[in-house]
Amino acid sequence: MKDLLNLLKNQGQIEEFDAIKIALASPEMIRSWSFGEVKKPETINYRTFKPERDGLFCAKIFGPVKDYECLCGKYKRLKHRGVICEKCGVEVALAKVRRERMAHIELASPVAHIWFLKSLPSRIGLLLDMTLRDIERVLYFESYVVIDPGMTTLEKGQLLNDEQYFEALEEFGDDFDARMGAEAVRELLIQIDLEHEIGRLREEIPQTNSETKIKKLSKRLKLMEAFHGSGNLPEWMILTVLPVLPPDLRPLVPLDGGRFATSDLNDLYRRVINRNNRLKRLLDLSAPDIIVRNEKRMLQEAVDALLDNGRRGRAITGSNKRPLKSLADMIKGKQGRFRQNLLGKRVDYSGRSVITVGPTLRLHQCGLPKKMALELFKPFIFGKLEMRGMATTIKAAKKMVERELPEVWDVLAEVIREHPVLLNRAPTLHRLGIQAFEPVLIEGKAIQLHPLVCAAYNADFDGDQMAVHVPLTLEAQLEARALMMSTNNILSPANGEPIIVPSQDVVLGLYYMTREAINAKGEGRVFADLQEVDRVFRAGEASLHARVKVRINETIKDRDGSITKNTRIVDTTVGRALLFQIVPEGMSFDVVNQPMKKKAISKLINLCYRTVGLKDTVIFADQLMYTGFAYSTISGVSIGVNDFVIPDEKARIIDAATEEVKEIESQYASGLVTQGEKYNKVIDLWSKANDEVSKAMMANLSKEKVIDREGNEAEQDSFNSMYMMADSGARGSAAQIRQLAGMRGLMAKPDGSIIETPITANFREGLNVLQYFISTHGARKGLADTALKTANSGYLTRRLVDVAQDLVVTEIDCGTEQGLHMTPHIEGGDVVEPLGERVLGRVIARDVLKPGTDDVLVPAGTLIDEQWVDFIELNSIDEVIVRSPISCETRYGICAKCYGRDLARGHQVNIGEAVGVIAAQSIGEPGTQLTMRTFHIGGAASRTSAVDNVLVKNGGTIRLHNLKHVERADGALVAVSRSGELAVADDFGRERERYKLPYGAVISVKEGDKVDAGAVVAKWDPHTHPIVTEMKGVVTFVGMEENITIKRQTDELTGLTNIEVMDPKDRPAAGKDIRPAIKMVDANGKELLLPGTDVPAQYFLPANALVGVADGAEINVGDVIARIPQETSKTRDITGGLPRVADLFEARRPKEPSILAEISGTISFGKETKGKRRLVITPTDGSDPYEELIPKWRHLNVFEGEQVNKGEVISDGPSNPHDILRLLGVSALARYIVNEIQDVYRLQGVKINDKHIETILRQMLRKVEITESGDSSFIKGDQMELTQVLEENERLSAEDKFVAKYVRVLLGITKASLSTESFISAASFQETTRVLTEAAVTGKRDYLRGLKENVVVGRLIPAGTGLAYHSERKRKRDAEKPVRVSADEVEAALTEALNSSGN
């Protein structure tokens, strides 16, 4: 019996739960929560401050105001616990029960819940199949609705206004039932027979033809099934009982002066209670219908305002004219419950202060002001003082600390020893924004920060502040030390390169000490060892830059760990020999035998990490920093006005450009060039002039003349301070130097267009008033952009984190063979990213074979490290298939093999790593560096001139890819396809460069030809789009009638006449439907066919085409018969920077997307409609042709009779990612999105590993759309989680039933976040009301799989060290499953026990 009582006691406390369910509350449920009914609107007696009985703060209902004390004071203290006072009716208990005890209000008339009414789509409306307006008219007492038509001609659900209602009453008397208000709607909802309706809808859907109707029906069906499956009843959406929030959650606080500060909810509840009581009274008095009706409507409005103020009509405002904060407002938005209190909380044991530089610290240390340390570690100090017996009580210890006695400082030092603290700088954009350090006590009030971690924090010392947090528990200290210590975070999680890299003065110092100078003091000396170099340098006998010979001993550690020692004499400089002293053993001397620029230093640290490991790298980084500081001090590099050397050629270049501009102006004045052409030419001219000036300036700055030892004149790299700063990468760039000593160049107007007159002056010469004024545009725009950008970038990061937060590595290997095709990323002829770089840290999906043989070079399942990369380069492998997050088949989470290397650690990723969040941070963190437009250069405009040829950069063999071409009489090839590419391969067959060839390009080489570097292999006219013949024959004009479809134009300059096809808009009525074309016939006038088809050879001419041949002319293969001018002056505004990244991740459909071929086949054109062309693709296999209507103004890339492949571009424009996924599949989509996003980041010089983008993409591809439901319960057109469909299909195929068929769907990140399985995560992201409404109706369960959900319920997250806790919990639970008891079993056991004891 005793055990049973314990069991019952434990039933009340829910500690262990696996899921959270949200559902509609039935009236019984609400009453069961309640501790009594609130009957009066009174709150607190203003004189006694005691709660009024039966009011909103009633102590009888909600519990005592003071701990263990009833209201009248009869029972006090703990011994009366649980007694209910007979005088005031209050139970003696803790006062905090007032935070959990609820009450209720019995409503005199039912009221609709506004969320289920107004949150779109309206759930009540969908169930009743009525429009929202109709339902509102019923609820707010404007119309009657027929509930039971009886034997009359009325229909159920029909709306009647007052007149119609009274007419019907006269006609039918009491045979029918029509009412208004929420009661009527409730009655209709009660009458719904869900099972019957579901069956009816399931039958109706397959028989319907119209798409819209099917959509509507399946929406209803889904909702009905949701109600049916969740155990919610439809009538529960209408409230008959209203729950009242516990009073301590809506406090009322007396202020001095007899006023009260109160929560808005109290006002809203008061309003409801007042109206409810008034309505009860009116009903008792059986008042006239119209008055009762008005009161009911007011009650409905009061409840609406309480639940969601402002959702319908005007928001109810308080005394201060502000809208009152309703229950819905409490939970949504940045200040709501989810984001303010559940996902983010305030922390104790923290402090903040200004940071300052700590050049003497080691990498794992930070300087903590004594004052701060004393405050932060107080409890530890108290404990220690007591333990030592220095203080008898905590109070005494407190006094000692307050007096700051000397022994307190000793204790503090002891407490702090090896107790790491966390330093955080806001904004924390990635995980390196919080790192752990060992504190070093310092005087002063500023925190000292190690200079090398500034890059990770993005900190500088111009007044930045940082926060300090103390990890208290042993576990927290352990994690801080093992995972968050600054020494463990040398590599950036975004790209796997060192982030602990010297910058600014350290770089300058190292660069200065490793530069060489001709004829410096001590040149030509030979030294026996490094120590001798050191001595001679210290004695002042040799300059830092002197070229000398040194004998060095080096220990070289190979990749495989073998160590070789050797001694050799090297040509080097004194400075480099000194630098080699601090390089760790195992590194070759060659790494420092060069000027140490920023890139070289970064490479050096990276190499050091891969060769000798973490510990030595950390020590080395510190040494580099100390050395750099020392030598930049010695160097004395400063900047003075005479460092800005202006090139002598500047005046000449500018004069020449001005002359040419005058020439163009005069051409424009005499009407030879148009305004647009003039503008373009002038801007091109000035761009070129600017480049020339900056070239001359850099040539001038970067070299200087000196006399060498023999007395001859020699040239060496300049020691100009400004040049050294830029060249070393310490500060500044060529673009900035150009503005200081070259010319500022072209400027942009606020609307982004470029001003024709450039600023020819530079800052050294000074700007005149006009020039200064032009500059202000860019500067102001830069500042405005920066402010906007920060907010936008933060929002992008938030969306990314939200979509990827539940992606965690959950297993080692999912066993898939799928993967992505990797090739080197080639752009405009340059290898932007070699294959080795792209596959580094990835796992190979299928064996890599030696080119041309079956020998396996790299077996599948290999994790590619630096050694393998060299091997791949060596064997000139061109393509590899690698595992990718996108193709990973793990159900929940992702597997380690598909992810590959953990970039921040350099080995295969651990189970439990939260790769989704890392990906989101890596992409979001550089967001603030991306442009809206450029900022630092001050809006100086940049423009490139149009490309019109292919110039080969490396010699090699020509390869033509995907190129359809015809051969001209002179042997040149003419491209007649759009997607053709020309590549140059080296002797190993590795691709070195690749170029796109536009339609009509004339190619002067053939497949397999050898070319030398610098050869021009293809040419085209960038300003026109040609139409090329594919055969020899005679031209005949079809439908080309002068001034009806064509007009002849005479060129004023040359006197030649051109035939121009008129735009259909400008044609007379007779010519609207005529399609001008050029037909090819043979010498006898017989129609020629296109080669390989039975389509007659005729070329239709689009509007504005210029025809270049005469009727009846003989032409050859590859001749251009017409040209279509392309507008280049109005360059299409390409969205760049942050907005472009956001568009790609949101998977937005571009405005005028490129049109892709839906199937493979032959192109023809059908009958035209108004403003549209009908494009027909006839498949080669004889199945049904595909038709599409395309607007006339779209320029088509295909001609009648051309063969296209599925997914080929028919009309140019920005690509639509949804089309790519549908026609070309997931890996083509991945390639497109990864490349597009990388292009934006690459432009800013930001490196992000591809797999981060793929990780986000995996989350965007979670959903599938059902195309055939098979034997599953899915409905065609439903969007489901891929994992759900796969599980269902596995079950079906096990039972030998038909599986559901589906297609993958791409969702934007916002949509993907909102449609995740976890409603807690979705609700805390955006659109809280909508998410919760939907979740409640469907009775959703949240299985707490992601990180956010667990943070909200206050658990450890299922990632990292928390994963162990979760799997342990699961293991324990599985072990003790049978012990769990249901409530029914308890009841049965109880009755049995009672019966047996009764006997």
Swiss-Prot record:
Q: Which UniProt keywords apply?
A: DNA-directed RNA polymerase, Magnesium, Metal-binding, Nucleotidyltransferase, Transcription, Transferase, Zinc
GO CC, alphabetical: DNA-directed RNA polymerase complex
Q: Which domain of life is it from?
A: Bacteria
Question: According to the record, how does the cofactor bind?
Answer: Binds 1 Mg(2+) ion per subunit. Binds 2 Zn(2+) ions per subunit.
Task: Return one Gene Ontology term, BP aspect.
Answer: DNA-templated transcription
Signal peptide span: none
Sites where the protein binds Zn(2+) 1: 70, 72, 85, 88
Catalytic reaction equation(s): RNA(n) + a ribonucleoside 5'-triphosphate = RNA(n+1) + diphosphate
Give the residues the record marks as binding Zn(2+) 2: 814, 888, 895, 898
Record note on quaternary structure = The RNAP catalytic core consists of 2 alpha, 1 beta, 1 beta' and 1 omega subunit. When a sigma factor is associated with the core the holoenzyme is formed, which can initiate transcription.
Outline what the protein does.
DNA-dependent RNA polymerase catalyzes the transcription of DNA into RNA using the four ribonucleoside triphosphates as substrates.
**Homology family:** Belongs to the RNA polymerase beta' chain family.
What is the protein name for this chain? DNA-directed RNA polymerase subunit beta'
Q: Which organism is it from?
A: Stutzerimonas stutzeri (strain A1501)
This protein's encoding gene: rpoC
